[in-house]
Amino acid sequence: MQELTYFNGEFVEPGAKVISIDDRGYLFGDSVYEVVRVVKGRCFALSYHQDRLYRSMREMDIPVKMTPDDLTELHEILIEQSEIKEGYIYLQISRGVAPRHHAYDRSKLEPQMLMSIRNLDMDAVNKLGEGVKAIALPDERWDHVDVKTTNLIPNILAQTKAEKKFAYTAMLFRDGVCTEGATSNVFAVKDGILYTHPADNHILKGITRQMILNRVAPSLGITVIEKEFDRAFVDDADELFFTDTIGGVIPITKLDRNPVSGGKPGAITLRLREALEKLMEEGLP
């Protein structure tokens, strides 16, 4: 199994210097991205990621040059060439290359596309099912985190603060309301019902989040309510968990100094994690 990198139409050696110093993605974080799980040698929920990618590009005014079929073929080529069975594909599209200037001329820019496929440490992924610690931090991101850009400085700082405190990640609060994690969405369980922040401009509409809302929870007969909730609700929740592309459903067993669900993964959380893993193994275009 070989990890591969693909840039603007050709495979390149790992570490190759292929990105221009005038690339707006490098200079300004002026680019969008997606991360897709590879499960049993297939992309999981690729069409969902593509839909979100195209939306991000429209919101960023980056021209769409490739069809969904073209992108699907590239993902399949990366998997075939690498022979990776369990991993992820990273895709980034920048606005293009031009001398540094904040404003851009769309007609003079050609989007630049980078893709890479990497192995996943499945032992580490499986261990997440045992539960993680999180810390609470203020949400200092901009007002359009629903657009998946590489402009991630607040996320980076929050994640670094969390890891320095030996936590898996940070749970973010904006004006007292729990929005999401530094790299994930957040769910709370109370009296058998799932709660998560509405999909507005203050959260990223996570693909795993969508799987829980629209497929996994309904298949288990679990009600989901999208509503804002505060720290008091979080502290009173029976269970808490994160969702993201790599880890799936990730039980939270400690928030700051407080144990969650008795310091072990909650029963509903584990049911959701197991059902999601089954869906991923079965596959979804």
Where is each model-derived feature located?
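Helix-start/capping segments and mature chain N-termini
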Residues: 1-77, 99, 103-285
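Ordered, amphipathic secondary-structure segments that act as subunit-interaction surfaces
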Residues: 80-93, 100
